[in-house]
């Protein structure tokens, strides 16, 4: 194999393909990145039996071929190269990378021992890359990180015709986002549970593409897989087994109090007051007509109080939240105005965004957050 490719193109492609390489591969070849040069294209692939990634870029190909090299090493080298065209060639058990006056020689791994990448499932539909990335980011923040509860580490993708609903929970908050897309089959109905971290990494990487193709396996080829493709990149991941708790009944539809606050001053106030909140201690919110009073700490230790303008419809209410979970939700609504809707101080509150103080709440994204019970 002998090829020539632009340094930035190579570095970006290698970083994408190598992102899911295992830190401790069960077999040495799984630490490798598979480079294949043919018909004016250089493809780079990785696979760890859970996640596969493949990207194709344009390259000048003098001699076609395939080589398997250490993915992390090639990623480090590609990132450090000067901004000059890069030549990659192979000679038996060695691969050579030349860029300007820099020259690297890498040992190759046995290509014949590398597993075949899983077949991409059939395309299910398409969604604009920015919409997909935004929706995933809004929902994945609520996914659990405890691997002993694998179901809660996933994002649930539910497809009903032209509507897609993403949902995740760690038991302390529940995030749900709906958006429209273009399905291949207008009558499609499907559910999948995708590892949240893999979905986040994929969504970020595919934002540069105009459209993202979502490919969900049915029975047959690619069963138990979901695939994503866009901007010359494709990835598959194995689905998690199980399903999230039935959540639609958890979201209240009637409220005793609804508070409306400008998001930016609310966020800044929570951050300041939380400075005195020790680990896992809550920030207390007291809503009255025209004002929100935030408090944290205790009289025995450091204490903080701040007042923020707020509109309140309904009864006055005092409630407490984990400040990190509250800030996550306020960041995720991505709106200038936040709406918090309450039933009681011991029941979950519903956070959503408004484009303006006097506008209706955006129903596309909902963030349900459990309150922290206060002693006494």
UniProtKB/Swiss-Prot annotation:
Keywords: Cytoplasm, DNA replication, DNA-binding, DNA-directed DNA polymerase, Nucleotidyltransferase, Transferase. GO terms for molecular function: 3'-5' exonuclease activity; DNA binding; DNA-directed DNA polymerase activity. It is found in: Cytoplasm. One of its GO terms (cellular component) is DNA polymerase III complex. The keyword Oxidoreductase does not apply. One of its GO terms (biological process) is DNA strand elongation involved in DNA replication. SMART domains: POL3Bc (SM00480). Its main location: cytoplasm. CDD domains: beta_clamp. Forms a ring-shaped head-to-tail homodimer around DNA which binds and tethers DNA polymerases and other proteins to the DNA. The DNA replisome complex has a single clamp-loading complex (3 tau and 1 each of delta, delta', psi and chi subunits) which binds 3 Pol III cores (1 core on the leading strand and 2 on the lagging strand) each with a beta sliding clamp dimer. Additional proteins in the replisome are other copies of gamma, psi and chi, Ssb, DNA helicase and RNA primase. Belongs to the beta sliding clamp family. Confers DNA tethering and processivity to DNA polymerases and other proteins. Acts as a clamp, forming a ring around DNA (a reaction catalyzed by the clamp-loading complex) which diffuses in an ATP-independent manner freely and bidirectionally along dsDNA. Initially characterized for its ability to contact the catalytic subunit of DNA polymerase III (Pol III), a complex, multichain enzyme responsible for most of the replicative synthesis in bacteria; Pol III exhibits 3'-5' exonuclease proofreading activity. This is Beta sliding clamp. It comes from Streptomyces coelicolor (strain ATCC BAA-471 / A3(2) / M145). The gene is dnaN.
């Amino acid at each position: 194999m002998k090829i020539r490719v632009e340094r930035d193109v190579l570095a970006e492609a290698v970083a994408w393909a190598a992102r899911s390489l295992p830190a401790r591969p069960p077999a040495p070849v799984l630490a490798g990145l598979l480079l294949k040069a043919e018909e004016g294209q250089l493809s780079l692939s990785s696979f760890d039996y859970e996640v596969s990634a493949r990207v194709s870029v344009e390259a000048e190909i003098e001699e076609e071929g395939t080589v398997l090299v250490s993915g992390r090493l090639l990623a480090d080298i590609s990132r450090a190269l000067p901004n000059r065209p890069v030549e990659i060639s192979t000679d038996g058990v060695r691969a050579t990378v030349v860029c300007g006056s820099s020259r690297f020689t890498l040992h190759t791994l046995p290509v014949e021992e590398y597993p075949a990448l899983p077949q991409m499932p059939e395309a299910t539909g398409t969604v604009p890359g920015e919409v997909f990335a935004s929706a995933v980011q809004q929902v994945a923040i609520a996914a659990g990180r405890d691997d002993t509860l694998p179901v809660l580490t996933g994002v649930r993708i539910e497809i009903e015709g032209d509507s897609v609903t993403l949902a995740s929970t760690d038991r302390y908050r529940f995030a749900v986002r709906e958006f429209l897309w273009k399905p291949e089959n207008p009558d499609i109905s499907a559910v999948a549970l995708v590892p949240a971290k893999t979905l986040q990494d994929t969504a970020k990487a595919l934002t540069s593409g105009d459209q993202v193709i979502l490919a969900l396996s049915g029975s047959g080829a690619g069963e138990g897989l979901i695939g994503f493709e866009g901007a010359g990149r494709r990835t598959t991941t194995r689905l998690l087994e199980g399903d999230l708790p039935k959540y639609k009944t958890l979201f209240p539809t009637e409220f005793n109090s609804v508070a409306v606050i400008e998001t930016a001053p609310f966020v800044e106030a929570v951050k300041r007051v939380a400075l005195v909140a020790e680990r896992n201690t809550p920030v207390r919110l007291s809503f009255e007509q025209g004002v929100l009073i935030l408090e944290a700490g205790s009289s025995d230790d450091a204490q903080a109080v701040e007042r923020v303008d707020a509109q309140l419809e309904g009864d006055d209410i005092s409630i407490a939240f984990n400040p990190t979970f509250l800030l996550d939700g306020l960041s995720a609504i991505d709106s200038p105005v936040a709406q918090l809707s309450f039933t009681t101080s011991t029941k979950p509150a519903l956070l959503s965004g408004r484009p303006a103080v006097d506008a209706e709440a955006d129903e596309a994204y909902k963030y349900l957050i459990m309150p922290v019970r206060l002693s006494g």
